[in-house]
């Protein structure tokens, strides 16, 4: 299911309008390192790292259930199909072969840069179980690097008491800046997107085959013959929207953590989809 979420995020880029705010937040807090929580398959934080002009030096991804192939899966990209000579000649008066070579070199350079700046913590990270300056994973305690904590499309997985516990632990024990973003909400546009999810899954499946090389016959059978996958993806999206937290509820939670300065709001993203953002940073005394 995370494959479909990743593909949808790459195509529609719903979080891109918020990247400027995140970049400014990092600058204000003088941060060049990010620890992404509940990363799953990566998604938006990888896009942010790729398009940000070198402010972010290192990104650590983490999850309670990290992918077994982690970084290889995250950084896998496939060169786009080459454009025809005729299209290049119509677009610009230069050698099409020179443009093709330049485009391919740019792709390889970006991929190499991404691989060198992104790491996936191999240990399972349970963000609800903290010790001072560390996180607990079953019986293993290990230090989490310093840096801004980010979360994308993750907050709706937690209840209000859990969100408060998470924020308070980060504020009192980590003392690191926090940025959380959600495209799931109870807004009508969000439910409209959920309604067309089955159609999107039908179109995204060939993309998974071409771009991520997910060549499993079961995926096609459970998508086109017996549409179990579209049903589960749709239900997952619906439940996520229903479990999302409103701005008012989050403001009430964060008001109980006066040690941090909090900024909570909504930015309009692609297709007018609302993006909820939460920024928290240690209060200057």
Describe the predicted segments one by one.
Residues 149-151:
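A conserved beta-strand element that flanks and buttresses the S-adenosyl-L-methionine
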Residues 158-174:
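A short, conserved alpha-helix within the catalytic core of class I
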Residues 170, 174-187:
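Conserved beta-strand signature within the Rossmann-like core of class I S-adenosyl-L-methionine
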Residues 191-256, 263-264:
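C-terminal alpha-helical "lid/dimerization" subdomain adjacent to the S-adenosyl-L-methionine
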Residues 1-36, 41:
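Class I SAM-dependent methyltransferase Rossmann-like catalytic core
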Residues 261-270:
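Conserved S-adenosyl-L-methionine
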Residues 269-285:
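Core SAM-dependent methyltransferase catalytic element
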């Amino acid at each position: 299911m995370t494959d479909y979420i990743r593909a949808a995020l790459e195509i529609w880029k719903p979080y891109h309008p918020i990247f400027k705010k995140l970049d400014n937040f990092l600058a204000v807090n003088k941060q060049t390192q990010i620890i992404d929580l509940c990363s799953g398959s990566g998604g938006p934080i990888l896009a942010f790292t790729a398009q940000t002009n070198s402010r972010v030096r290192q990104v650590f991804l983490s999850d309670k259930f990290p992918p077994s192939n982690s970084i290889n899966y995250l950084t896998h990209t496939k060169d786009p199909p080459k454009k025809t000579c005729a299209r290049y000649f119509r677009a610009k008066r230069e050698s099409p072969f020179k443009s093709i070579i330049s485009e391919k070199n740019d792709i390889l350079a970006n991929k190499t840069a991404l691989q060198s700046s992104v790491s996936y913590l191999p240990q399972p990270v349970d963000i609800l179980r903290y010790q001072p300056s560390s996180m607990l994973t079953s019986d293993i305690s290990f230090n989490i690097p310093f840096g801004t904590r980010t979360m994308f499309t993750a907050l709706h997985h937690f209840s209000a008491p859990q969100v408060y516990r998470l924020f308070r632990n980060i504020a009192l024990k980590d003392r690191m800046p926090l940025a959380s973003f959600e495209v799931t909400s109870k807004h009508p546009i969000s439910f409209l997107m959920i309604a067309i999810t089955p159609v999107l899954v039908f179109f995204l499946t060939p993309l998974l085959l071409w771009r991520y090389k997910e060549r499993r016959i079961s995926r096609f059978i459970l998508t086109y013959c017996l549409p179990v996958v579209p049903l589960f993806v749709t239900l997952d999206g619906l439940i996520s929207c229903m479990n999302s937290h409103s701005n008012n509820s989050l403001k009430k939670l964060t008001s109980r953590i006066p040690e941090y300065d909090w900024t909570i709001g909504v930015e309009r993203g692609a297709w007018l989809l609302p993006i909820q953002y939460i920024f928290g940073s240690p209060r200057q005394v």
